Amino acid sequence: GNFIGMLPQSMQDSKIYGVEIDKISAGIAQQLYQKTSIAAQPFEEANIPDSFFDAVIGNVPFGDIRVNDRRYNKHNFLIHDYFFAKSLDKLRPGGIMALITSKGTMDKESPAVRKYIAQRADLLGAIRLPNNTFKGNAGTEVVSDILILQKRDRLIDLEPDWVHLNTDENGVKMNAYFVDHPEMVLGEWKTVSGRFGEEDTVVPYENADITELLEEAISNIHAEITDYEVDEELTEEDNSIPADPEVRNFSYTVVDEKIYYREN
């Protein structure tokens, strides 16, 4: 609901669809934002067509667990990596994806997932947040990244620098993107004692306004937004919406006072 509630004025007329695994949270969001369509189900069960959305925004779950989805099982993705892969498939070519994830996505030793993403999307920019960013909202102290990607129109086999890790001038090993763009790290690197011994983390700058730092970092990210190209031979407007899992296949339903027919 936070993403919907903070939508800029220029996007107020957008058609918004959400997926929320917690039924209570989904119900609250649906009541607060009644013009949206919120599916109360796990993301892996969401029946959403490919190349459907202009933008995908979310806060992906973290954890060392895997999701059972036959389409993606061969990749052996951890849950946060799975969210990136499926979200990219649901995004139209040229569409923008902005996801909050743990620093593990960018900093893990294996480059496999980053290469998978790079083949399908261009990294427009990444912002590393200090470890207290979500402490007040979620009660967690974890270094998080905002990754902003633009989907490619075709698969490309390449490995940009951000697929790999590098070491900064202080000997801290991290994603090469943040070594090359230290201004996108909104805090100071410190070595602290963690659950598994010493670990590198990002602590907030003293007396710094995270909102101002974030706005400045975002101003460094640029993209050319392309309009979706509609086939001129199509004679009817595509008014399809993601299928409601509670509506039986090949049956009619009413959404926002309009009649729809569910087909797959």
Describe each PLM feature range.
Residues D64-I65, M106, I156:
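Short glycine-rich, flexible loops that bind phosphorylated cofactors or substrates
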Residues H222-N264:
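Charged, often flexible domain-edge or linker segments that flank or initiate folded functional domains
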Residues G1-G58, G63-I65, F77, G94, ...:
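Conserved S-adenosyl-L-methionine
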Residues G136-T235:
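Flexible, glycine-/basic-rich loop-and-beta segments that form/coincide
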Residues P61, N131, R152:
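Flexible loop residues that form catalytic
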Residues E45-I48, N132-G136:
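A short acidic, often aromatic-flanked loop/helix-cap motif at beta-alpha or helix-coil junctions
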Residues V19-K23, I28, N76-K135, V142-L149:
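Conserved Class I SAM-dependent methyltransferase catalytic core
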Residues R70-H75:
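Short glycine-enriched, charge-decorated loop/helix-capping segments at active-site entrances
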